[in-house]
């Protein structure tokens, strides 16, 4: 299973995360408290042993091109309603690996209908982006309506995000069966990545592989 621990800010956090995760991420051009500068992102990307995704809510080709060129990243995670043709242009011009995030409602009165609408939206990106991520949105650290995620996971490969932590990951992954997980605040203590929480998260996640 693909494991991404996002929102690192320092070399110290990177050194911890890369021992346990398949990928990590840095937050750029965002209102998030985890936002860092292009210069810091470049520093982390250059020394990382695992892929670092540049994660942002920017929604234009020019803004993403600037991020890619300033940081040297080959991995991006798009959290916006960016025009599909501009995403294709990014892929063609920079050959970046792309995770495209889709927001799932916190609570849905009609999960089947919401899942159908999301599937129709997601299928436009088939063979264009590399991974599909389902998230609650805006790094809230809260789960979304998992009934929707379950329906989608039965039809397509998804990376699940939103409110995951060491204490709920086992049950949630058993229900949803995603191909990957992505989290940030769920393994933080005092606003920093905590190695003991990460180890516990991985232990409980791996329980599902037995």
Curated annotation (Swiss-Prot):
Under which main EC class is this enzyme filed? isomerase
| Any GO BP annotation | L-tryptophan biosynthetic process
Q: Does the keyword Protein biosynthesis apply?
A: no
Reaction catalysed by this chain? N-(5-phospho-beta-D-ribosyl)anthranilate = 1-(2-carboxyphenylamino)-1-deoxy-D-ribulose 5-phosphate
Q: Which InterPro entries match?
A: Aldolase_TIM, PRAI_dom, RibuloseP-bd_barrel, TrpF_fam
For this protein, the record's Gene3D superfamilies field holds:
Aldolase class I
Report keywords, A-Z. Answer: Amino-acid biosynthesis, Aromatic amino acid biosynthesis, Isomerase, Tryptophan biosynthesis
Give the pathway: Amino-acid biosynthesis; L-tryptophan biosynthesis; L-tryptophan from chorismate: step 3/5
Q: Which GO terms describe its molecular function?
A: phosphoribosylanthranilate isomerase activity
Q: Is Hydrolase tagged as a keyword?
A: no
EC number(s) in its UniProt entry?
5.3.1.24
Cited HAMAP family: PRAI
Q: What family does this belong to? A: Belongs to the TrpF family.
NCBIfam families found in the cross-reference section: PRK01222.2-4 (NF002304)
Instruction: Please identify the protein, giving its name as recorded.
Output: N-(5'-phosphoribosyl)anthranilate isomerase
**Which species is this record about?**
Methanococcus aeolicus (strain ATCC BAA-1280 / DSM 17508 / OCM 812 / Nankai-3)
**Gene transcribed to yield this protein:** trpF
């Amino acid at each position: 299973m693909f494991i991404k621990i996002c929102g690192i800010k320092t070399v110290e956090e990177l050194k911890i995360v890369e021992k346990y995760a398949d990928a990590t991420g840095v937050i750029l051009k965002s209102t998030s408290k985890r936002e860092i500068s292009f210069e810091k992102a470049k520093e982390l990307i250059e020394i990382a042993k695992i892929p670092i995704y540049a994660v942002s809510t920017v929604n234009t080709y020019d803004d993403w091109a600037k991020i890619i060129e300033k940081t040297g990243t080959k991995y991006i995670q798009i959290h916006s309603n960016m025009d599909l043709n501009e995403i294709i242009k990014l892929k063609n011009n920079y050959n970046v690996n792309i995770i495209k995030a889709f927001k799932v409602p916190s609570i849905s009165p009609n999960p089947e209908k919401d899942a159908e609408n999301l599937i129709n939206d997601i299928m436009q990106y088939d063979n264009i982006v590399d991974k599909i991520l389902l998230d609650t949105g805006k790094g809230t650290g809260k789960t979304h309506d998992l009934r929707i995620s379950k329906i989608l996971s039965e039809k397509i490969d998804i990376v699940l995000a939103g409110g995951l932590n060491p204490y709920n990951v086992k049950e949630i992954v058993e229900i949803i069966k995603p191909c990957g997980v992505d989290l940030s605040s769920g393994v933080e203590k005092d606003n920093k990545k905590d190695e003991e929480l990460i180890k516990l998260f991985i232990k409980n996640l791996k329980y599902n592989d037995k």
